[in-house]
A protein has these predicted regions:
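Conserved catalytic network of the ASCE P-loop NTPase/AAA+ motor domain
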Residues: 98-101, 128, 161-164, 192-197, ...
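A short, basic N-terminal segment
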Residues: 1-86, 231-232, 236, 242-250
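P-loop NTPase Walker A phosphate-binding motif
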Residues: 118-132
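Pre-Walker A (pre-P-loop) alpha-helix and adjacent loop at the N terminus of AAA/AAA+ ATPase modules
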Residues: 66, 79-106
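Loop/turn-to-beta-strand initiation segments
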Residues: 104, 132-133, 165-169, 197-203, ...
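Walker A/P-loop nucleotide-binding motif
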Residues: 102-121
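Short glycine-rich substrate-engagement loop in P-loop NTPases that contacts/grips substrate
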Residues: 84-92, 103, 128-165, 184
Length: 250
C-alpha cells in the first residue's frame, strides 16, 4: 500500500481543499503527516489503556468506579452555606484542575455527612468525563477483596496491581475499621506504589490529623504531602437530614 505522505497524493489533496481546511489541517509536510499519524496512534493507545484499566478495576469489585449514590455529584450542585464549605469547594476544584494535567494527593477530614464524598465524587466524575480511570472505595471493601483473593488461592498481588493502576484512587472511611497492623501495612503498600508511580491518592476520613497519623503511620502521611498534597477540614454539621432521593413509581 502506498504511503500518501510520499506519493504526492497529500499535495493534491491540499490543492483541492478549501483554504479554511488548509488553515485547520494539523500537518503541511510529509514529515508532519507521519508525526501526526504517530501522535494519533499514541493517543488512541493511551485511551484504550485507560478504558482497560477502568474496566479491570471495576471487574474486581463488581461495580462502577463511583457508587450510584454519588454519580450525579458535581461542583455545580454542591450546596454552600458557610465559608468552610466555600473553601472546601475551592480546594476540590483546584485539586481537579491539577489532576487534569498531573497528579496530587488529598485528605478530606470531617464528621459523617459533611460532603466529603460529594466533592471527592465530583472530582472523580470530572476526570471520568475526560476518559480518566477512577475508583472510590472504602478501606473495608479493599480489605475484604484482598482477603477474598487469598481465600480463593490467588495472590493479592494482581488485586493490588489493578488497584494501583487507575488514574485516581480515593480511599473512603479510612480509620473506621481500626484494623491496626494489617490495615496499616495495606495502606502503606497502596500509597507507596501509587506515589512512586506518580498516581494520585485521596483519603476520606472522620479522624483528625493526629489520629490519622497514629493509624496510618508517619510514612503514609508524609507521602500524602507529595505533589502539593492537601488536607481539607469539613468541620460543620451533617447535611444528610436534608437529602431525599425520590424513586420513580412504575
Amino acid at each position: 500500500m502506498k504511503n500518501i505522505a510520499d506519493s504526492g497524493i497529500l499535495a493534491r489533496i491540499r490543492k483541492l481543499a478549501p483554504q479554511s481546511a488548509e488553515r485547520a489541517a494539523p500537518f503541511r509536510t510529509p514529515e508532519e503527516w507521519r508525526e501526526w499519524q504517530l501522535a494519533e496512534g499514541r493517543r488512541s493507545c493511551e485511551e484504550i489503556d485507560r478504558q482497560n484499566r477502568q474496566a479491570r478495576a471495576e471487574k474486581i469489585f463488581g461495580r462502577a468506579g463511583i457508587q450510584r449514590l454519588h454519580r450525579g455529584c458535581s461542583f455545580a450542585n454542591y450546596r454552600i452555606q458557610n465559608d468552610g464549605q466555600r473553601h472546601a469547594l475551592s480546594q476540590a476544584k483546584s485539586i481537579a484542575s491539577e489532576l487534569d494535567t498531573g497528579c496530587t494527593n488529598f485528605v478530606f477530614s470531617g464528621n459523617p455527612g459533611t460532603g466529603k464524598n460529594h466533592l471527592a465524587a465530583a472530582i472523580g466524575n470530572r476526570l471520568m468525563n475526560t476518559g480518566r480511570s477512577v475508583i472510590v472505595i472504602t478501606v473495608a471493601d479493599v480489605m475484604s477483596a484482598l482477603h477474598a483473593s487469598y481465600d480463593d488461592g490467588k495472590s493479592g498481588e494482581k488485586f493490588l496491581r489493578e488497584l494501583c493502576g487507575v488514574d485516581l484512587l480515593v480511599l473512603d472511611e479510612v480509620g473506621v475499621q481500626r484494623e491496626t497492623r494489617n490495615e496499616q501495612v495495606t495502606l502503606n503498600q497502596i500509597i507507596d506504589r501509587r506515589t512512586a508511580s506518580l498516581r494520585s491518592v485521596g483519603m476520606l476520613t472522620n479522624l483528625n490529623h493526629e489520629a490519622l497519623t497514629n493509624l496510618a503511620g508517619q510514612r503514609v502521611m508524609d507521602r500524602m504531602t507529595m505533589n502539593g498534597g492537601r488536607w481539607v477540614n469539613f468541620d460543620w454539621g451533617s447535611w444528610r437530614p436534608n437529602v431525599s432521593y425520590l424513586r420513580a413509581v412504575k
